[in-house]
Amino acid sequence: MGKIIGIDLGTTNSCVAIMEGNQVKVIENSEGARTTPSIIAYMDDNEVLVGAPAKRQSVTNPKNTLFAVKRLIGRRFEEKEVQKDIGLMPYSIIKADNGDAWVEAHGEKLAPPQVSAEVLRKMKKTAEDYLGEPVTEAVITVPAYFNDSQRQATKDAGRIAGLEVKRIINEPTAAALAFGLDKAEKGDRKIAVYDLGGGTFDVSIIEIADVDGEKQFEVLSTNGDTFLGGEDFDQRIIDYIIGEFKKEQGVDLSKDVLALQRLKEAAEKAKIELSSGQQTEINLPYITADASGPKHLNLKITRAKLEALVEDLVERTIEPCRIAIKDAGVKVSDIDDVILVGGQTRMPKVMEKVKEFFGKDPRRDVNPDEAVAVGAAIQGQVLSGDRKDVLLLDVTPLSLGIETLGGVMTKMINKNTTIPTKHSQVYSTADDNQGAVTIKVFQGEREMAAGNKLLGEFNLEGIPPAPRGVPQIEVTFDIDANGILHVGAKDKATGKENKITIKANSGLSEAEIEKMVKDAEANAAEDHKLRELAESRNQGDALVHSTKKALTEYGDKLEAGEKEKIEAALKELEDVLKNASSDKAAIDAKIETVATASQKLGEKMYADMQAQQAGAAGAAGAAAAEGAAQGGAQTADDVVDADFKEVKKD
């Protein structure tokens, strides 16, 4: 059985890790980095770039370079968060036929799971290159506050990437696993994981206990905001720069997608620099032009200014902390350790706020970029049966229920319930002789169903005619270890049953997923063909170069006919290499022709080299013989007799 890899599929960056024995290994990608930007670029020639190569070309290809797609995964187009992003993103966010938020690149409509699958495929390939064997199974992390649709969409992304997702695990829980197994402290500890990533914020209160030699990680509560993260911090800087430039130059950069992409890059860089320095300078020459000529942007930003710009964003993270503490039934003073996860937690203002709320310094010995992937790899080892000393008890982040008479949300499973869990309740009909009931399933904390997220609905038909309130319909909610909901309804009188895994009227259908899996496989085959073609072209170029060089040096030793034959074969190979539509077979055939025609040339080169070596060896032998004769004469004359006396210690 192959290894189960751990993948942190992040909004801004992603990371992959595996366990080797009891040691964790965060794997470097093909560019040599331990994290990969979650950026995907669709090129004109149908090539798809992922990670650093995609990021590098984003300024010149803003409409087809997709980033922060995780913010759209499992979301409806109408959601206010999606509407907010439409005005900010250089790429197009569109409404799919089923009402979901999709994106567009080169006129092609793409589902967020399909785009995220490209990042997962890169993570899979990174692990395969390191292990030297195929990888088919993974544990993928999601923000703890992700709802059912978002979890299901993440699982779909894994399938499209060719991975069997063994478990969806919450990011703060994964970070706690990485932290807890790394520490030797005995006894029970309560920790708070504050996870502020590129697009999402989570906080979880987790108890780590030693139970009969096994470390038990029990999530007591979780809270968060799935639309708050580093991207929002970047946006505040971008808005500030646009405002200042407009005041100074009278030009609005927000309408220029190329300028916006440069601003995004500069804002991210400035934010990072201000985590260590007090001031930074944003310098972007030729940012735009008007009738008076080119315009340059030069702006100084201080750390104090940045903190003023994002103060309310940092403040927004504190209320979820307060709720999580309350829901866990603990006091702030009960928290032993505070762990920071996510790149945005490197900002001094964030650390200061966290310290102020929890009353203690956050731990500095956890890598905020890698802890989540490490935790996922540990969970992968547990699921493969190779590790028995860890037990993980996670929770469902939001309450689940159904709509009952009057549009009320009747909760079946409350938030922060340990999963997996199952709950059944009996309901009845609202009208006389009602032959069918529609079960609408919602997720959220509001009293009225309409204020919560509709996960899906289904019908139970064939209920025998009876007065209202008489039929007994048992509704069962079952949440699996991935936090994904399965619902069933059963008429107790007839035994009629209807079960669904919540697939809202949103989300990808089975047929769509299958098509995307097939497309991905076809792309992989196409990529392989392109790589083989590139290798043949390289081989052809190298052969042309080496043969021409050999002809220059040894051509005069060939008969005229032989030389002409080689030159003709070379010309044919050069022509086929110049033709962009040449396939691998055509190039390989011409390579073979040149190789065959050059045999005589090779023989001449070989004979010449052997003659040179023989000449050199003869000269070296003569020199060695002369040296030996001189050495022999020296030996007799140059012997020095020496007296010596042995000194004995008493």
Swiss-Prot record:
InterPro entries associated with the record: ATPase_NBD (IPR043129), Chaperone_DnaK (IPR012725), Heat_shock_70_CS (IPR018181), HSP70_C_sf (IPR029048), HSP70_peptide-bd_sf (IPR029047), Hsp_70_fam (IPR013126)
Low complexity bias: start-end ranges: 613-634
Taxonomy, superkingdom: Bacteria
A Pfam entry, by short name: HSP70
Keywords attached to this entry: ATP-binding, Chaperone, Nucleotide-binding, Phosphoprotein, Stress response
Phosphothreonine found at: T200
TM regions (residue ranges): none
Function recorded in the entry: Acts as a chaperone.
Cited HAMAP family: DnaK
Homology family: Belongs to the heat shock protein 70 family.
Protein name: Chaperone protein DnaK
Species of provenance: Burkholderia thailandensis (strain ATCC 700388 / DSM 13276 / CCUG 48851 / CIP 106301 / E264)
Encoding gene, per UniProt annotation: dnaK
